[in-house]
From Swiss-Prot:
Catalysed conversion reaction: UDP-N-acetyl-alpha-D-muramoyl-L-alanyl-gamma-D-glutamyl-meso-2,6-diaminopimeloyl-D-alanyl-D-alanine + di-trans,octa-cis-undecaprenyl phosphate = di-trans,octa-cis-undecaprenyl diphospho-N-acetyl-alpha-D-muramoyl-L-alanyl-D-glutamyl-meso-2,6-diaminopimeloyl-D-alanyl-D-alanine + UMP
Disulfide topology: none
Pathway info: Cell wall biogenesis; peptidoglycan biosynthesis
GO molecular function, one term: phospho-N-acetylmuramoyl-pentapeptide-transferase activity
E.C. number: 2.7.8.13
Family under the similarity heading: Belongs to the glycosyltransferase 4 family. MraY subfamily.
Source taxon at top rank: Bacteria
GO cellular component: plasma membrane
Subcellular location: Cell inner membrane
Physiological role: Catalyzes the initial step of the lipid cycle reactions in the biosynthesis of the cell wall peptidoglycan: transfers peptidoglycan precursor phospho-MurNAc-pentapeptide from UDP-MurNAc-pentapeptide onto the lipid carrier undecaprenyl phosphate, yielding undecaprenyl-pyrophosphoryl-MurNAc-pentapeptide, known as lipid I.
One Gene Ontology biological process: regulation of cell shape
Name of the molecule in the record: Phospho-N-acetylmuramoyl-pentapeptide-transferase
Transmembrane annotation, as ranges: 29-49, 75-95, 101-121, 138-158, 194-214, 226-246, 263-283, 290-310, 315-335, 370-390
Amino acid sequence: MLVSLANWLQGHYPDSFGFLRVVQYLTFRAVMSAMTALLLGLVFGPWVIRRLTELKIGQPVREYGVQSHLVKTGTPTMGGVLILLSIAVSTLLWFDWSNRFVWVVMLVTFGFGAIGWVDDWRKVVQKNPEGMASGEKYLWQSLIGLVAAIYLAFSVSETSNLRVLELFLRWVGSGFSNDLPPKADLIVPFFKSVSYPLGVFGFIFLTYFVIVGASNAVNLTDGLDGLAIMPVVLVGSALGLFAYVTGNSVFSKYLLLPHIPGAGELLIFCAAMAGAGLAFLWFNAYPAQVFMGDVGALALGGALGTIAVIVRQEIVLGIMGGIFVVEALSVMAQVAYFKYTKKRYGQGRRILLMAPLHHHYEKKGWEETQVVVRFWIITMLLCLVGLSTLKLR
């Protein structure tokens, strides 16, 4: 919004508002976006926590889980609303409203946030321990993920929505046989010119998997004070750098990455996500005053997945978000092994003491803060590995 306002003022009053040219610089707007989201979160955080407490929106804790967590019963949840509102206000202020990629990320983020909000509301307010039925939740996630995937399949290769429509119609007219341009290929990191052509259906499937998978993986990771939000900040910031490089024709050519016009504007969203995340961490650090709930975790995971697809770094997201991947795999392996052994031996057995993985380490005697900080350190290292793919080829 401020970009359009600055352009209008410079156009009508160039002598008085020439200093507003600084708003055209993407890096300046990214810094301001992060600061705006951070300040909004810090200022309104206490009020949001008080309101959640007054409304008795408290976190239920499983009695058969880690016993030290029972003291957290009643801690306000659904604090992800604070994160999302901070991101929304900051992004809307500082990004170029004509950029279609930011709108796609915003729609996915708030679509998944709405799913999480309904899930949290049913759990906490309506006292339904299951929240949304898993099938219902997956249905809505799939709907949003598929809509985004179909649009992105054609938009990452074109510079405008009109050209996106033309590409789509050519694909339909070819009997669904035309391939996508090379920009839509799956990039294999650490290799100079290695990519895999996905085709339209392959791109849609991969995009759907990345968006929905990332959303659920972040949600599964959000089980300890501060555990999920800091990796989200780190991975989101790293993806912001990829967006900046991919959106710049000079840098992308030098680093042998596909140039996606308009992708650089995603840096504004990533900066807002980092600022809002750090503000939330102020209140979510041990001992947490508030939890983000599904409304925050599902939304942030969906945002990371969507950004990774747009900047063509799906594999790198898996590297940098390795903690999210391992946490999700730990749950899948635990459930699958339990069902298999119960069917074969009549009694279910477990691979881990408790899933997700962070609870396994708690059961082994690690303190909660040890698990959290060590997972942060691992994420920092993985983000450095991911960023190294910019040059190490």
